[in-house]
């Protein structure tokens, strides 16, 4: 009930202003009695993933809490994990405003944020400051002004800094809003990046005496052959996990709607089937060797179950969470427990 009232107010506001207000409010209330407005008790439904045990299979996707400011509030809502970021080595403002658009009739969102964040050092401070023991994945990317050919260095810098504080590290090479970024998903550039990250991971595991898994986040806009090549590279470089998928550049299911022609990545309900299809193809190619987090267009427990059936071990929500509220977490966990 509270969320429906809050949502009604927020949906009257500019989307990015509403987002910033929400994150600020959650930051202030995460560890106070005021979190009773959104906190919920969710019975455990433990799941093993990448050698870790999560209290339930529902996580918050990257992009909601880029700088890790409201982690404790999302813990109170019952998420099994939170993925913060995307974070870059240096702070950057992202793309010009406006850059976030609701497509309410389609339960969708278009964003061209462009990795706006306060930088990896600021994120590390927030990871150290969090009060709860929730599992936090850190999604890392490259700065916009770093040439793609040198992008590998940005990922290594971020990995080095977040490694001691992350439950796992997600490598984002699939955002459509950083020029040239998606080219890292193909051929030699992909292989070189994954190889360098794996080498760095093993060095850091030795240094910190703990093994932090690494996962690759991929786009939905890939051919079958491209998915096969990515899967082969993941297996070859002994990556621990995959996250499928990021937002799409297609506009299927939203044509004619206000804001549908805005550039950027489309998320939400129109992405549901495409994302599930990619998960299924990727799972087939990986053949059980590497587990998958399914994300993209989960608007109901049924959508989440379809991701599990396609081959995902865990799921993440973002747009569906904005449209449905915290109750969606509980609904998915309960459906998962019964499946």
Curated annotation (Swiss-Prot):
SUPFAM superfamilies: FMN-linked oxidoreductases (SSF51395)
Database matches in HAMAP family: DHO_dh_type2
Location in or out of the cell: Cell membrane
Keywords: Cell membrane, Flavoprotein, FMN, Membrane, Oxidoreductase, Pyrimidine biosynthesis
Protein origin, superkingdom: Bacteria
Binding site for substrate: 66, 111-115, 172, 177, 246-247
Any Pfam family: DHO_dh
Residues involved in FMN binding: 62-66, 86, 139, 172, 217, 245, 268, 297, 318-319
EC number, as in UniProt: 1.3.5.2
Family: Belongs to the dihydroorotate dehydrogenase family. Type 2 subfamily.
Function: Catalyzes the conversion of dihydroorotate to orotate with quinone as electron acceptor.
Record text on subunit structure and interactions: Monomer.
Entry cofactors: FMN
A GO biological-process term: 'de novo' UMP biosynthetic process
Enzyme class label: oxidoreductase
Membrane topology category: Peripheral membrane protein
Cofactor details (free text): Binds 1 FMN per subunit.
GO CC, alphabetical: cytoplasm; plasma membrane
Recorded GO MF terms: dihydroorotate dehydrogenase (quinone) activity
Biological source species: Shewanella sp. (strain MR-4)
Protein name: Dihydroorotate dehydrogenase (quinone)
Active site: 175 (nucleophile)
Catalytic activity: (S)-dihydroorotate + a quinone = orotate + a quinol
């Amino acid at each position: 009930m509270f969320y429906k009232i809050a949502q009604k107010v927020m949906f009257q506001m500019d989307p990015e202003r509403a987002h910033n207000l929400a994150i600020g409010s959650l930051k202030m209330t995460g560890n106070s009695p005021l979190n009773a407005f959104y906190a919920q008790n969710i019975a455990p439904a433990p799941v093993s993933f990448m050698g870790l045990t999560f209290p339930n299979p529902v996580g918050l996707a990257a992009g909601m809490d880029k700088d890790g400011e409201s982690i404790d509030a999302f813990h109170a809502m019952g998420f099994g994990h939170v993925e913060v970021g995307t974070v870059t080595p240096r702070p950057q403002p992202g793309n010009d405003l406006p850059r976030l658009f609701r497509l309410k009739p389609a339960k969708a969102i278009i964003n061209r944020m462009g990795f706006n964040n306060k930088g990896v050092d600021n994120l590390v401070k927030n990871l150290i400051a969090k009060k709860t023991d929730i599992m936090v994945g850190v999604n890392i990317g490259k700065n916009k002004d770093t040439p793609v050919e040198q992008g590998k260095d940005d990922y290594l810098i971020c990995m080095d800094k977040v490694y001691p504080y992350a439950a796992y590290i997600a490598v984002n090479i699939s955002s459509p809003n950083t020029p040239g970024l998606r080219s890292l998903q193909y051929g030699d550039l992909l292989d070189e990046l994954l190889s360098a990250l794996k080498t760095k991971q093993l060095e850091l595991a030795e240094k910190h005496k703990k093994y932090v898994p690494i996962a690759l986040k991929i786009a939905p806009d890939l051919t079958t052959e491209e998915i096969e090549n990515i899967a082969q590279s993941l297996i070859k470089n002994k990556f621990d996990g995959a996250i499928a998928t990021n937002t799409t550049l297609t506009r299927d299911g939203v044509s004619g709607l206000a804001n549908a022609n805005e550039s950027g990545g489309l998320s939400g309900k129109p992405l549901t089937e495409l994302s599930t299809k990619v998960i299924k193809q990727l799972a087939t190619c990986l053949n059980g060797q590497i587990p998958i987090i399914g994300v993209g267009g989960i608007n109901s427990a049924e959508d989440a179950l379809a991701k599990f059936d396609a081959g995902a071990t865990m799921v993440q929500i973002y747009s569906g969470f904005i449209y449905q509220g915290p109750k969606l977490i509980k609904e998915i966990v309960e459906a998962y427990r019964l499946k």
